[in-house]
Amino acid sequence: MLISIIVPIYNVQEYLSQCLDSLEGQLDTNMEVILVNDGATDNSLAICEEYAQKHSNTIIINKENGGLSDARNAGTMVAQGNYIYYLDSDDWLAPDAILTLYDYAVKNSCEIVQGGFYYAYEDYLLYDNSIKTAQVLNREEAMLELIKNESVKDFSWGKLYRADIVKKHIFPKGKYFEDSYWQHIVVHDCAHYGIVPTPLYYYRQRSTGISGTFSLKSLDLVQGYEERLEFIKGYYSNYIAEMVLSLWDTFYSLMSVANKQEDYKKAFEDYWEVLNEKYGSLFEKYLSSDLRFRIRKTYPSILPLYDFILRIKSRIKSSNLVKISLK
């Protein structure tokens, strides 16, 4: 068996058929599709069963709801492929996505290959075309790019992994933003990280914005980056400065949202004290030139004005994305 495609599923009946239909035409007898029903209460299981009746290389796993990480782990444990691919059940693939990544992995001896992707909105697609050509990074290069979340993206979907690597490292159960706990570990086990910039994955953007999905569980992302910082301190000491900045950037972005929501503002203020106690010396050492950090320590009352300036800059940066209308 060459490739196992793992699809975690929970209450996505509205999108699941499009996801599974996108696999048509790119499967052969050397591939298997593992559909992990994570305790869905809608019509998702019936859609899975209908798909499995038409495709003999499909396995359905039924389990109690345990979250995305637990569902991925369940699929990974039974996967027979030499490579594993994670496809989220509300997203979908371009034709030949799987074989494109597989061919590149074999040709370039890559343990992981990342494909390009679209941000898929209802009426249009967005594509970041900053990476112009395919490339192979070594372990150190890939880790630095992951820390900066630039050419190596901090997500698990849309990448082809050699199975022996991911089977060693399970996803953390019960965590939001599970990738922040996991990606650096598998990249560390990767001598050759391939990047194919061609957009092969459609990453569905729901209508609910960050304010609508924001909660205290958003701190899981910060805690994942805290674990990553400790990992970087142990294995990649030359990258501590970049990782400290990444941790600070992440917390600052979440704090900016929390400040607008009374339910969460104090909790994030309290967590800032925890972070500052743990990493204050590193912040002082590596963030001395970061204006946001200096403002937060000295003139916190003017942070809203500075946030406004940052939002303007963010819009300018996002204008570099290629927009493709669907109507």
Predicted regions and their residues:
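A conserved acidic beta->alpha catalytic loop
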Residues: S22, N37-I47, E64
